[in-house]
Amino acid sequence: MTKRKKKTTFERLSGMNRQQRKELQRRLYSGDPGLEVVHPDAAGIDIGNDSHFVAVAPSRDEQPVREFGSWTAELEKMAEWLKACGIRTVAMQSTGVYWFAVQDTLERHGLEVFLVNARHTRNLPGRKTDVQESQWLLKLHTYGLLRNSFRPPEEIRKLRNIWRLRDRHVGESARAVQHIQKALISMNVRLANAISDISGTSGMAIIRAMLRGERDPIKLAALRDRRVRATEKEVALSLEGVWQDDHLFELEQAVDMYDFQQKLLAGCDRKLESYLAALPAREIAAADKQAPPEEEPVVTGESTDSKKRKRKRNKGKRTSGNAPKSFDLRAELKRVCGVDLTRVDGLDVMVVQTVIAEVGPDLGSRFASEGHFTSWLRACPRPDISGGKVIRQTREPSSGRIMKGLRMAASSLLRSDSHLGARYRHLRMRLGAPKAIKAMARQLACIIYRLLTKGHAFVDAGAEQFELKRKERELARLKARANSMGLQVVPIPA
């Protein structure tokens, strides 16, 4: 069989008729890549701190690229100019926080805004200027080559902003506790060795008494709560230190910072409660409620044994110490979601609230399937296909807040006597801890998607069922391997 010779450019041109050559010449001179125009009324904006560059098609205005300032009045002029040019949709990169005001202004004027990832809009090397960047965004958006980023509704965005702000205050409180512990250790006051949480009731009572001038270890140890495991004598021994004025001042400053952060946390909790109360109660339509497959741990209906396991598990399930204490967050989340996501092993109110604050409870209208949802979370590898074959599977970094919470929830399943706990231990033994944690985080994301879209009631199938099915699969593999070698697996008589 002779190898087919590749035609040169001149040979391909000679094979064209007159009409084909004219069409090729028109495309070359006009810069038309031959793609289908998806958004004819499009514009591109290069977002900046001091100014924004806006590009429209040359046929829309004599000056197709204009620069507008970042003032509110300039943003209004930008929106009016785009409407005068007949623009309906605009593409811009999500650069820092500079795009917030631009998007709000354009949407208020009735323009559709495509917020795109900057990694998906890279231009050719050497063409990184503000004008060329806006024109490049215009060209990509005109031919429908950009993917709009997910942005939840306004009420969910408000909830997300408060929850993220609260998370920062929690981090600042933790740093204040570290400064408190540093000041105590500097005076050789080893309170943390006797009391695990110095920011708790006993720890703060003792520390505040120190700041009021009390130095007697016996009197300070008497302030401990009776639930503290360490004896009063052990606590008193840990409070014998070298009292120094500079370290006491450092301790006072750290306690003031901790109290200030706790005050800010209380304000965030009140705002969070009002935003959650404003969200409507969600009821999943009866048509969407479907019975899940039997092999999944999400099932409808409960047996007597599963009820006993659930009561035993919920009894020992602690609420996170950083959860709001001024209202019942679990009850509010159940009302907003329509299902109780905290019944899933590993998920507490903090993880569930993070999921709801980031994407909202209505996942079905935003993500077509659980595969789309986990892909958006970067919880699954991205296959690179060439020649009809998967040549590699790239794992993108998943540093989002939802995946952080799900990974923490997955790692807490190590000692869980449940179906998910047994599966995590099995994967941990096979793949190692990092891969097992990410795999279980993806499974938790799939369970959340099913619960929020189908209205399943979560009932733990139990670790025994997982082990039973695992042994059945292993036995089936052994039989298949024995048959391939002409052998037979014979059970040992009891």
Model regions: which residues?
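A detector of single, family-specific signature residues
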Residues: M1-A494
